[in-house]
């Protein structure tokens, strides 16, 4: 490798953007095939290609940052800006769902019975499973902060314990949400209430699964001593993402479960 006189990471040629684009094409085409012809072969191929691409691409990023030293302070600064912009884009994504919910609920049409929840809809009790879910996510926010502070203080064992607790709470939240969906007295096809409820809470649930996966990767990386108190952006990004998921849930709980019921 030639000597470089700047602090920026000039990435090497990589096949993963190409395989990632191909997997996206296979997944979207596979979804159409599944919807119209009830065949999951193409979708399965797309998902497999996507998983392999993500694994190998992020493996390369870890190699470049942890073992090759390409992630200098300037590069980390750029990654931080990138993560902040990504979270802002996610905030706008969820803003659309809240807009749809409030647009429908603040001025219910005659077709809905002129009331909210619409006539015939029996909403979930906000003081049962949704309240438990809220406390679970708030507790996970505390434990991820404990993990971050432990890492900053160089206390590896406490960091691993706190991270494991956070992951366990994330998995517990997902199971509670799945049971709530299974027992819900309405479906996604029950008018605007069902569609806004399931799309907003469903996308939040997907983000919890993504965040839990992010934290599991951080847990295994910490087992291999990848993070130090001064070099741990991978974990920091996961913590930021988890706090974002927390805050979105609080808005969902207050808007859709509590006020909307």
Curated annotation (Swiss-Prot):
Mitochondrial matrix-side segments: 1-15, 67-72, 153-155, 224-232
Membrane topology recorded in Swiss-Prot or TrEMBL: Multi-pass membrane protein
Mitochondrial intermembrane side: 35-40, 106-128, 184-190, 257-261
Domain of life of the source: Eukaryota
Keywords: Membrane, Mitochondrion, Mitochondrion inner membrane, Translocase, Transmembrane, Transmembrane helix
PROSITE patterns associated with the record: COX3
Enzyme class, broadest EC rank: translocase
Main location, first listed in the record: mitochondrion
One MF term in the entry's GO annotations: cytochrome-c oxidase activity
GO annotation, biological process: mitochondrial electron transport, cytochrome c to oxygen; respiratory chain complex IV assembly
Function noted in UniProt: Component of the cytochrome c oxidase, the last enzyme in the mitochondrial electron transport chain which drives oxidative phosphorylation. The respiratory chain contains 3 multisubunit complexes succinate dehydrogenase (complex II, CII), ubiquinol-cytochrome c oxidoreductase (cytochrome b-c1 complex, complex III, CIII) and cytochrome c oxidase (complex IV, CIV), that cooperate to transfer electrons derived from NADH and succinate to molecular oxygen, creating an electrochemical gradient over the inner membrane that drives transmembrane transport and the ATP synthase.
Family membership noted in the UniProt record: Belongs to the cytochrome c oxidase subunit 3 family.
Quaternary structure, from the entry: Component of the cytochrome c oxidase (complex IV, CIV), a multisubunit enzyme composed of 14 subunits. The complex is composed of a catalytic core of 3 subunits MT-CO1, MT-CO2 and MT-CO3, encoded in the mitochondrial DNA, and 11 supernumerary subunits COX4I, COX5A, COX5B, COX6A, COX6B, COX6C, COX7A, COX7B, COX7C, COX8 and NDUFA4, which are encoded in the nuclear genome.
Protein name per the record: Cytochrome c oxidase subunit 3
Gene source species: Nanger dama
Gene: MT-CO3
């Amino acid at each position: 490798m030639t000597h470089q006189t700047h602090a920026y990471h000039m990435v090497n040629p990589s096949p993963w953007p190409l395989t990632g684009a191909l997997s996206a094409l296979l997944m979207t085409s596979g979804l159409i095939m599944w919807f119209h012809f009830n065949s999951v072969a193409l979708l399965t191929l797309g998902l497999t290609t996507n998983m392999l691409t993500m694994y190998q691409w992020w493996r390369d990023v870890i190699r470049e940052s942890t073992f090759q030293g390409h992630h200098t302070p300037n590069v980390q600064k750029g990654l931080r800006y990138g993560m902040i912009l990504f979270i802002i884009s996610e905030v706008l994504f969820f803003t659309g769902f809240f807009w749809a919910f409030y647009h429908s609920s603040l001025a219910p049409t005659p077709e809905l019975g002129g009331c909210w929840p619409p006539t015939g809809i029996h909403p979930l009790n906000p003081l049962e499973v949704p309240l438990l879910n809220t406390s679970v996510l708030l507790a996970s926010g505390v434990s991820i902060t404990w993990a971050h502070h432990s890492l900053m203080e160089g206390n590896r064992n406490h960091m691993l314990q706190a991270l494991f607790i956070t992951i366990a709470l994330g998995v517990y939240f997902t199971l509670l949400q799945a049971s709530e969906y299974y027992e819900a007295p309405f479906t996604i096809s029950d008018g605007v209430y069902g569609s806004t409820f399931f799309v907003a809470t469903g996308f939040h649930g997907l983000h919890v699964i993504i965040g839990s996966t992010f934290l599991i990767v951080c847990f295994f990386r910490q087992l291999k001593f990848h993070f130090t108190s001064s070099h741990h952006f991978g974990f920091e990004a996961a913590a930021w993402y988890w706090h974002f998921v927390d805050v979105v849930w609080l808005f969902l709980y207050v808007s859709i479960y509590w006020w909307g019921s």
